[in-house]
Regions:
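Non-cytosolic coordination micro-motifs
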Residues: 1-28, 32-153
Length: 153
């Protein structure tokens, strides 16, 4: 099923992307024309980014970066996104990112579970991790940060 089959016509369309806002569980979904090769857990092309409101504690950024380079956190906007080739893989990536942030899984365990679950998906098996978000997107997630005290004088 394509994004248009599931979510209808995009809210925005440019030469390089299609954008849907507030579609299903997502704050935003973007399908990019530019393909980004990605080899975890197996070679594929990342083209579909999906975004949720989510505040990641600063001390968890390195763990998320080690877990999956296609999971991106924007601290200022309070967003976390996954970019893959299938919506199910984006659900999986974000669900496991939540598991890493909350301490339910280690980085290594999350990577192993991701690889096994994607392999199962390719063989026609499903998992609750592929079917939807297993956490609630947050509210008031933006972090405006602050200027150093030395600049406040």
């Amino acid at each position: 099923m394509t994004a248009m089959d599931k979510y209808g016509a995009p809210n925005e369309a440019t030469e390089t992307m299609l954008v849907w806002h507030n579609n299903g569980p997502w704050k935003r979904s973007v399908v990019y024309k530019k393909e980004v090769p990605h080899d975890f857990p197996m070679p594929h092309i990342d083209v579909w980014e999906q975004v949720v409101d989510y505040r990641v504690p600063v001390d968890k950024f390195d763990d998320l970066a080690a877990y999956d380079g296609s999971v991106v956190v924007d601290r200022t906007q309070g967003e976390m996104s996954a970019r893959c080739d299938k919506e199910g893989a984006n659900f999986l990536a974000l669900n496991l990112a939540d598991d890493v942030v909350t301490g339910r899984r280690s980085v290594d365990d999350a990577r192993q579970f991701y690889a096994e679950t994607v392999k199962g998906m390719m063989e026609g098996r499903s998992s609750p991790y592929l079917e939807g978000l297993r956490f609630r997107p947050m509210s008031a997630t933006n972090d405006r940060d602050m200027a150093p005290m030395s600049m406040m004088k």
